[in-house]
Amino acid sequence: MERRVAIVTGGLRGLGRTMAFGLARDGHSVLAVGHIDADVAEIEAATAGTNVSGHILALVADLRRPSDCDRVVAMARERLGTPQILVNNAGLTFTTIDPARFRRPEPQKFWQVSDDIVRAVIETNYIAADQMARRVAPEIVAHGWGRIINVTTKLDTMNRPHTSPYGASKAALEMATEVWAKEVAGTGLTINIVNPGAGANTPGMAEEMRQMSREGRVPRLVEPDEMVPPLLYVVSRAADNVNGCRFDANLWDLSLPPAEAARRASRPAGFEMHPQPG
């Protein structure tokens, strides 16, 4: 296994934290980026008590700011080496858009969401990912090997009513993945998506939804650890020719060889629009 330098955004909590530790356990050097200062000490303590063959550094940054994206890439390069893997996981969820959605008599309409929330969600879920990708891609292409992995969501979450602008932000990143993958074809950089494939059991999920899942009233939530096997496959040399795909973790079959599990859990990134009439 070749050791690589990885940046995981949204890497101090939830899915990102689990993916950061998964990469480190696989021997990679990881810069985990989040936005809450208290999480840094927790990551450092967890790293000290965990058997990882790689290394994890924790950093607080606001990736909506171009200057902070520059700082993240510079720190990775200075402390760990040239970034070869970027996991764009940072995101704001429904609990940010409408914290009281399960306590409202009527669901929130898109025009009731404040300008500040709309801007924060779009900037965090799409623009931050775009900014980070544009900063690491040139060096990866120059070196001839690397990975960008975006975390989006499933289509029926993107187009679900009363969740705007979450779906729009993830749809933008989904389509960007398709476009970017076409542009880097043949360069050694691949760009793919790794998704839970269903709601994820993280603090970003409303507690009411987590409780309903525990009671069996809604489908099972995906555990963060389920993201690690598809992620490790995508960053491996076995996936050198895998580009422009999305992998849903809830479809990954651990009983199969990774390449076969990947084949069954994957489909092309992006969308097929409704056909023209006639």
Walk through the language-model features, giving the residues of each.
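C-terminal helical subdomain
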Residues: 193, 210-278
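The beta1-alpha1 cofactor-binding region of Rossmann-like NAD(H)/NADP(H)-dependent oxidoreductases
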Residues: 60-72, 115
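Catalytic loop of short-chain dehydrogenase/reductase
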Residues: 92-93, 104-117, 147-172, 177-178, ...
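Active-site-adjacent segment of SDR/Rossmann-fold oxidoreductases
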Residues: 26, 140, 158, 179-189, ...
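Conserved glycine-rich cofactor-binding loop
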Residues: 12-13
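A short, exposed helix-loop element centered on a Lys and neighboring polar residues
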Residues: 133-134, 178
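Conserved glycine-rich Rossmann-like NAD(P)H-binding loop of the short-chain dehydrogenase/reductase
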Residues: 26-42
